[in-house]
Amino acid sequence: MAPIKRGDRFPTTDDVYYIPPEGGEPGAFELSKFVKTKKFVVVSVPGAFTPPCTEQHLPGYIKNLPRILSKGVDFVLVITQNDPFVLKGWKKELGAADAKKLIFVSDPNLKLTKKLGSTIDLSSIGLGTRSGRLALIVNRSGIVEYAAIENGGEVDVSTAQKIIAKL
């Protein structure tokens, strides 16, 4: 599938999972209901605890979350295929456990990732097929206003600073 681009409707699937902020067991994240009439930023990453994601990509979004939200964004959605328990631990490790507007969702079967046209094959280093790195701005009508899709493992066009400049 071709990568998502400006003007495309943001695809939804309810086959993504999370652990609610109040805790408990993992459950389905009703993406189709949650995103309705909201403006949001999507950040897709290859994997929790991987050096580029943990040291370069996500820290910018965490540090700049108040600034992003001040631009009329309702929340930032982080997507990767790791399970919800790993994502909860990663969010805590990143110092963002209490950031309710930063939502980490698991796409274990890559259904959403495939709809975004953003998979990356990391089999050569033992990681299999993963979510590719990208960032999107989605408006309240569910249309992608801006799409930044990285080549391979780069961390450049999808950084928080570049997304803020487009908000």
Swiss-Prot record:
CDD domains: PRX5_like. GO terms for biological process: cell redox homeostasis; cellular response to oxidative stress; hydrogen peroxide catabolic process; methanol metabolic process. One of its GO terms (cellular component) is peroxisomal membrane. The keyword RNA-binding does not apply. One of its GO terms (molecular function) is thioredoxin peroxidase activity. Coiled coil: none annotated. Its EC number is 1.11.1.24. InterPro entries: PRX5-like (IPR037944), Redoxin (IPR013740), Thioredoxin-like_sf (IPR036249), Thioredoxin_domain (IPR013766). It catalyses: a hydroperoxide + [thioredoxin]-dithiol = an alcohol + [thioredoxin]-disulfide + H2O. Its main location: membrane. Gene3D superfamilies: Glutaredoxin. SUPFAM superfamilies: Thioredoxin-like. It is found in: Peroxisome membrane. Residues 4-167 form the Thioredoxin domain. Keywords: Allergen, Antioxidant, Membrane, Methanol utilization, Oxidoreductase, Peroxidase, Peroxisome, Redox-active center. Induction: By methanol. Pfam families: Redoxin. It comes from the Eukaryota. The active site is at 53 (cysteine sulfenic acid (-soh) intermediate). It is a peripheral membrane protein. A motif (Microbody targeting signal) lies at residues 165-167. Belongs to the peroxiredoxin family. Prx5 subfamily. Thiol-specific peroxidase that catalyzes the reduction of hydrogen peroxide and organic hydroperoxides to water and alcohols, respectively. Plays a role in cell protection against oxidative stress by detoxifying peroxides and as sensor of hydrogen peroxide-mediated signaling events. The active site is a conserved redox-active cysteine residue, the peroxidatic cysteine (C(P)), which makes the nucleophilic attack on the peroxide substrate. The peroxide oxidizes the C(P)-SH to cysteine sulfenic acid (C(P)-SOH), which then reacts with another cysteine residue, the resolving cysteine (C(R)), to form a disulfide bridge. The disulfide is subsequently reduced by an appropriate electron donor to complete the catalytic cycle. In this 1-Cys peroxiredoxin, no C(R) is present and C(P) instead forms a disulfide with a cysteine from another protein or with a small thiol molecule. This is Putative peroxiredoxin-B. It comes from Candida boidinii (Yeast). The lineage of its organism: Eukaryota, Fungi, Dikarya, Ascomycota, Saccharomycotina.
